[in-house]
Swiss-Prot record:
Keyword Transmembrane attached: no
Signal peptide: none
DRBM domain span: 31-98, 123-191, 236-304
Compartments, record wording: Cytoplasm, Perinuclear region; Nucleus
GO aspect biological process, one term: regulation of regulatory ncRNA processing
InterPro entries registered for this protein in UniProt: dsRBD_dom (IPR014720), PRKRA_DSRM_1 (IPR044465), PRKRA_DSRM_2 (IPR044466), PRKRA_DSRM_3 (IPR044467), RLC_Component (IPR051247)
UniProt-recorded name of the protein: Interferon-inducible double-stranded RNA-dependent protein kinase activator A homolog A
Source species: Xenopus laevis
GO CC annotations on file: cytoplasm; nucleus; perinuclear region of cytoplasm; RISC complex; RISC-loading complex
Residues forming coiled coils: none
Length: 309
């Protein structure tokens, strides 16, 4: 009596696949974000997502995320943050596979139909405030730095400050710009260990420059500012403001804005750690010109406040 031989069962490999195609074949249901996260874990290069822009109205928002993994950078845009992240991850996967000519469409399959649209998005403003309370910091301060564009297409730039940390956000409404700025600060806090930073360092040692102290100051630089015109061409206002800051003992920081102005010029903000905080906007044909313009505007403001009774 002959024995029938059954085919041998395939050997199971205990090794985990390391190539993208192998990982996708093993887990075909994984989303691009999950697949890229798995790839990053295996290679030691974890993907980092940063919210670049939030535009549109409440009923039709548009988000843009920048993704960095190793030496690769990609952008993704979509009607929700998750969709934008998925598209950025998909494009990064295509680059890793060596195919930059296509970006596979990613449908918004992550939306929960049981939740209304206003509950779909995260609330970075609220999250940042909660973080500040947990750490014992002062609550976030938001300042409108600029409003530009025609009435039907306004563009707002808002600065968000938590202690000495500052970020800017731009959007088609103040609320959107505020959310972007808060999101950027939250992302920054995720990359640093705030638990190891002493509170006195966060608060800073140069927060005592008030308007009254400026008015009563007899320092050389501030006295010169009070009596000098600020309309002389080719003046180095950056140096002039730096000299005033050193004399009055406040911090001076320039924040470059990624987006160009409606006229195609560079933009920046000059932030002075006076009490209260002073933020002035500047534009120019170069980054240096924008800094000089912001310094000029800041000096004009200081001069007005020093003379004002």
């Amino acid at each position: 009596m002959s024995q029938e031989r059954f085919p041998a069962a395939p050997k199971m490999s205990s090794e985990k696949p390391t190539s993208l195609d192998a990982m996708r074949a093993t887990n075909p249901c994984e989303t691009p974000i999950q697949l890229l996260h798995e790839f990053g874990t295996k290679t030691g290069n974890h993907p980092v997502y940063t919210l670049e822009k939030a535009e549109g109205q409440a009923h039709n928002p548009s988000f843009t995320f920048r993704l960095v993994i190793g030496d690769i950078t990609s952008l993704g845009e979509g009607p929700s943050k998750k969709t934008a992240k998925q598209k950025a991850a998909e494009f990064a996967l295509n680059i890793l596979r060596g195919d930059t000519s296509k970006c596979l469409p990613v449908t918004d399959t992550l939306r929960d139909p049981k939740k209304p649209p206003n509950q779909m998005q995260e609330n970075p403003v609220g999250s940042l405030q909660e973080l500040a309370v947990q750490k014992g910091w002062r609550l976030p301060e938001y300042t409108v730095a600029q409003e530009s564009g025609p009435p039907h297409k306004r563009e707002f730039t808002i600065t968000c400050r938590v202690e000495t940390f500052v970020e800017t956000g731009s959007g088609t409404s103040k609320q959107v710009a505020k959310r972007v700025a808060a999101e950027k600060l939250l992302t920054k806090f995720k990359t640093i260990s705030t638990d190891n930073i002493p509170l006195n360092k966060l608060i800073g040692n140069k927060m005592g420059c008030t308007w009254d102290s400026m008015r009563n100051s007899s320092g050389e630089k501030i006295s010169m500012l009070k009596r000098s015109p600020l309309s002389i061409p080719n003046t180095d206002y950056v140096k002039m403001l730096k000299d005033v800051a050193e004399e009055l003992d406040f911090n001076l920081t320039y924040l470059d804005i990624d987006e160009l102005s409606v006229n195609g010029q560079y933009q920046c903000l000059a932030e002075l750690s006076t009490n209260p905080i002073t933020v002035c906007h500047g534009t120019g044909i170069s980054c240096g010109n924008a800094h000089n313009d912001a310094a000029h505007n800041a000096l004009q403001y200081l001069k007005i406040m020093c003379i004002k009774k």
